[in-house]
Amino acid sequence: MGGDALTFKLFGLTFNTTNIVSGLIIYAIVFFTLYGMSRKIQMKPTGAQNVFEWLVDFTNGIVRSQMPASEQGHYSFFAFVLFVFIFFANQFGLIFQFHWNGAEVLRSPTADPVVTLTLSLMVMVLAFAAGVAHNGLGGYLKGYTKPFTLMLPVNIIEDFANFLTLGLRIFGNIFAGELLMSLIANMAFSHGILTIIPGLFLELAWQGFSVFIGSIQAYVFVTLTTVYISRKISE
């Protein structure tokens, strides 16, 4: 971390070049990684196919644990893609941090609240759409008055709070991780050999911990996604 993101203007709107470039690279990494894992499917899986099948089983397990059986097939693929994308997005900044003229060119997209809140908004809109499709518009809106009418404002506030916490939780963890990693790197080069060696060990230790945190955050995000969708369907 450190420095502002690169931006450009188009039709009077400001676009974040850093997030766009980083996101496109992650899309490519995810696509080619999954394509390589699944290109030669065998009855007896080995190597990359084992990892691929484990990922599918893992995300299917999340969906099965939270959603009714009749709806699981509709959201299994979405949960799989969402988990893999967020996992790679969380780890991206640990490897690819690039600055140019004091501005960040590459970083983890999930270290930007705009990206994480956009993902959160996408999830909430999907949950609302699923609720309307399953219960009808009238039945869905009636769910806001349960268990009694006075709960209407509380239920509305709960949805807004879910939207904020889903996005800001992952942003806070990834941003803090990359910020501390930058601080450790600056400390390592502050006093020559006296700080380089301990700084190197600290950096490696923190990177390992950040991989763990990034994985947990991807899991939490997908789990809460299935929880929110399941609740809207059942209301």
From Swiss-Prot:
InterPro entries associated with the record: ATP_syn_F0_a_bact/chloroplast, ATP_synth_F0_asu, F0_ATP_A_sf
The keyword Electron transport is annotated on this UniProt entry: no
Name of this chain's protein: ATP synthase subunit a
Keyword Magnesium applies: no
Gene Ontology terms: cellular component: plasma membrane; proton-transporting ATP synthase complex
Pfam family, one: ATP-synt_A
Keywords: ATP synthesis, Cell membrane, CF(0), Hydrogen ion transport, Ion transport, Membrane, Transmembrane, Transmembrane helix, Transport
Localisation: Cell membrane
Topology term for the membrane: Multi-pass membrane protein
The protein's assembly and partners: F-type ATPases have 2 components, CF(1) - the catalytic core - and CF(0) - the membrane proton channel. CF(1) has five subunits: alpha(3), beta(3), gamma(1), delta(1), epsilon(1). CF(0) has three main subunits: a(1), b(2) and c(9-12). The alpha and beta chains form an alternating ring which encloses part of the gamma chain. CF(1) is attached to CF(0) by a central stalk formed by the gamma and epsilon chains, while a peripheral stalk is formed by the delta and b chains.
